Amino acid sequence: MNLNDITFLLSVHGLDQLPEDGLPEFAFAGRSNVGKSSLMNTLLRRSGFVKVSGRPGKTQGLNFFQAAEDCMLVDLPGYGFARVSKEMQNNWQKLITSYISEREALKCVVVIIDIRHEPKALDRQLLDWLREQKVPVLPIYTKIDKLSGNQLSRHAAILDAGHGIKKDERILFSSKTGQGRDELIAVLESYLA
């Protein structure tokens, strides 16, 4: 997978705008402010390429990034943020739900969860729904550099239990240190083989 040659392709606000090139797609989902953009920038080794915002709700469409001729990375709007209108939240939910359930090019949804917080109902609902839809899912616990070793193990175990995740089914990730990047690339590449 060539992540050195990455370009922003387009922002999609309706299913009729989806690219039709047939490249494999990997979607990145997570609650607002869990470190989704930072994770994507670390993955690409390009600081600031995917816009990072301290303001939740910044991503408002499905943002497609093309990695050479290999695949697409799709940045989904963050969920669970209350400062946008209910109508906007509903529109995002419909768009994301339709995209995930209908898109044949979608190979895996990377679900990003902040390890510092207790299990959230919205994360569990998304994980359960993806499993029901038979969509491959890769949970990633971010911001691991913010916890000590003992805290990290305890928080990971709590999230695993709360979300029905086995230890070998998820990745611990730090955008600050890059830990987990190689594991993430290996999993994504396994879908391209």
Curated annotation (Swiss-Prot):
Pfam family, one: MMR_HSR1
Record Gene3D superfamilies: P-loop containing nucleotide triphosphate hydrolases
Positions of Mg(2+) binding: 37, 59
Cofactor requirements of the protein: Mg(2+)
Transmembrane region(s): none
Entry GO CC: cytosol
GO biological process: one example: division septum assembly
EngB-type G domain mapped to chain residues: 22-193
Keywords: Cell cycle, Cell division, GTP-binding, Magnesium, Metal-binding, Nucleotide-binding, Septation
Positions with a binding annotation for GTP: 30-37, 57-61, 75-78, 142-145, 173-175
Disulphide bridges, residue numbers: none
The keyword Cell membrane is annotated on this UniProt entry: no
An annotated Gene Ontology molecular function: GTP binding
CDD domains for the chain: YihA_EngB (cd01876)
Sequence similarity: Belongs to the TRAFAC class TrmE-Era-EngA-EngB-Septin-like GTPase superfamily. EngB GTPase family.
Free-text function comment from the UniProt entry: Necessary for normal cell division and for the maintenance of normal septation.
Protein name: Probable GTP-binding protein EngB
Species this chain originates from: Desulfotalea psychrophila (strain LSv54 / DSM 12343)
